[in-house]
Amino acid sequence: MTTHLGQPGRPRGLVGWIVGRIMRRHNRPDNVWTLSLLAIGDGERALEVGFGPGDAIRLAAEAAPSCRIAGVDHSATMLAAARQLNRVFIEQGRVRLSLGSVDALPFADDAFDKVFSINCIYFWRDPALGLGELRRVVRSGGIAALTVRDIERAPYDAYRPDTLARLMTEAGFASVVIHRNGVPSHPLACVLGTK
């Protein structure tokens, strides 16, 4: 099921650039919290699907100085914004960003230790296919994390945490667990699973 939300779903042009700046500020707590649960370590390889303006990638690169991070997003506008934000890490060879889709990730099997997506599953054309791709590119014993707003209204209600946990289990992830941030003013859930 795809939820089309206009500019937030695929930011483009000047308006998309502005939307990206707003998303960067608004999603900062989501990024920080998800990365704290995922705990990307030095020397690990991580992938973010739907990186938007690139804030989570930057935070991860800053927190683990020898990690390698890749990102895929389907918005050329967000790719440009994320490249600008992560320019130093790209020049160091620690970050690699590309235009693409969760439906066909441009990476080899078992390429990453950790994979994550924050507030993006709402825009996936086929969540089961996307989760299968995440499982394909994460190594055995690796972890996948999907963070969503823990809200019971559209469009967020389509991917409630229990639904996400079921979808991850059906995609072949094990030890699937739901974490909630416990912040009533900004409720989030992160579903973690192991390959």
Where are these regions (language model features)?
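Conserved alpha-helix/loop element of class I SAM-dependent methyltransferases that forms part
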Residues: 25-44
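Core SAM-dependent methyltransferase catalytic element
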Residues: 183-195
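Conserved beta-strand signature within the Rossmann-like core of class I S-adenosyl-L-methionine
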Residues: 141-149
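A short glycine-rich, Lys/Arg-flanked "PGG" loop and its adjoining helix->strand segment in the class I
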Residues: 128-140
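A short acidic, Gly/Pro-enriched loop at the edge of an enzyme's catalytic core
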Residues: 103-114
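Class I SAM-dependent methyltransferase SAM/SAH-binding core
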Residues: 45-104
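Helix-to-beta-strand junctions that scaffold the AdoMet/dcAdoMet cofactor pocket
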Residues: 64, 124-125, 138-139
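A short SAM/SAH-binding and catalytic strip from SAM-dependent methyltransferases
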Residues: 114-126
